[in-house]
Amino acid sequence: MWGYFFGGNSQQKKDLPKKAIVELREHIQTLNKKKNHLQQQMDDQDQLARKYVSSKQTTLAKSALKRKKGYESNLLKVENQIETLETQLISIEGANLNLETMKAMKQGAKAMKQIHGEYDVDKVEDTMDEIREQVELADEISEAISRPVGNEFVDEDELDEELKELEAEAKEQEQEHRVPAQKAKPQPVSREEELPQFPSVNKKAPVVEEDEDEEALKALQAEMGL
């Protein structure tokens, strides 16, 4: 430890906080074990004193209470030591945490300084100006490419006049379709066309039917041998 204050090894300086924290935790653990042991001895002497009081052994009871008081005094000292070490441990852990935080911040500041050393505000402004110029150039190129070709000399007034003529023509055609067509005059109907049509009767049809019946009768008679 004295080497730390009088320029000892740098590695030992770095490891000293961690080593102190470990040693403090181990010693606090040892004191807690001692505390539990003293508490148990106090309880044993208290029970022994109660036993002697019950058996009317006053002298032995006083001796047990005396030993209990001794253990109680030692227990109080141990508890105070534990409290002191715990306070110191918390302080060292906090200081060590602050140290590690400062190291990280210092390393971060060093990295930022290295990064910013490669450019400054003027360089950033120059870069932004170059970007703006390139964006404007890209817009001009895009506009030139998308501009229509061959329609620069079209007369807009002439187009409007032609459009009006087409609209007037369409309106005129629409009005013509709305005028009802004249009904055709009815043609005179002849007398014959006015009379109802009846199917013509074939007067020779019964003769044909009679001949067929006669032939059928003759065939039947021949078949029967008549």
From Swiss-Prot:
Superkingdom of origin: Eukaryota
Localization terms from the record: Cytoplasm; Endosome membrane
GO biological process: cellular response to lithium ion; cellular response to pH; filamentous growth; filamentous growth of a population of unicellular organisms; filamentous growth of a population of unicellular organisms in response to neutral pH; filamentous growth of a population of unicellular organisms in response to pH; fungal-type cell wall organization; late endosome to vacuole transport
A Pfam family assignment: Snf7
Membrane-spanning segments: none
Residue stretches in coiled coil: 18-182
Region described as Disordered: spans on this chain: 168-226
Membrane topology summary: Peripheral membrane protein
Name of protein: Vacuolar-sorting protein SNF7
Keywords: Coiled coil, Cytoplasm, Endosome, Membrane
Cellular component aspect of the GO annotation: cytoplasmic side of plasma membrane; ESCRT III complex; multivesicular body
Job description of the protein: Required for the sorting and concentration of proteins resulting in the entry of these proteins into the invaginating vesicles of the multivesicular body (MVB). Also required for the proteolytic cleavage of the transcription factor RIM101 in response to alkaline ambient pH.
Species this protein is from: Candida albicans (strain SC5314 / ATCC MYA-2876)
